[in-house]
Amino acid sequence: ERLNGDIDQMTSMIESVLQYTQSEMKFEQLRQISLQSLIGAIVSDFQDANQPVKFVEQDSLAVSAKTILFNSKPKLFYSKILSAQNVIIYARPLSMQRAITNLIDNALKYGRKANVSLQAESQKASIIIDDYGDSETVENLKQLTAPFKRGKNVKNIKGTGIGLAIVSTIAEQHGGNLTFDRWEEGMRVILSIPR
């Protein structure tokens, strides 16, 4: 009975945190922000704390777009934007900062170090965080976006099981999504936001 009471209390607490996050986002105004600048500032804060985080910056980014100019079949073409600083989105800056910070923090906790990069397409921008962990599967990570879910690799790592739920909520509130993949040395988390 005591265990059920504790679980109910924790569930209530997490629902309150998620409601707070959602209501906070309603009051924070959408603004035009440079993802390059935001990511650079966040990564710099981690580096100032001697954390192994690297922003894999690109001088220019490939941008893909579809066009149907006087043609019955859409064609895919690629063009380069002049500077990665041109990756602008309309977003709630504090919420985006919270989401990116949480993803980097998770990469450090469970994957030893983090590489952050930015990809842009005509309709969306993707913030990619690669870690060097190896014990979670993509399917397990997808399940971790539910509140109070923690992975099998947590061992003695402190956490509440709400971080990815909050990031997922922030992504959805911006019309975006959170996806997971593997890369040759670990896990990849992709936060995609419409442009």
What are these regions (language model features)?
Residues 24-29, 84, 88-91:
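Conserved micro-motifs of the catalytic ATP-binding
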Residues 96-97:
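A residue-level detector for a conserved hydrophobic packing site
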Residues 103, 163, 167:
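Short alpha-helical Gxxx[C/S/T] motif in the catalytic ATP-binding
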Residues 113-123:
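Short beta-strand/loop element within the Bergerat-fold HATPase_c
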Residues 136-148:
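Short conserved segment of the HATPase_c
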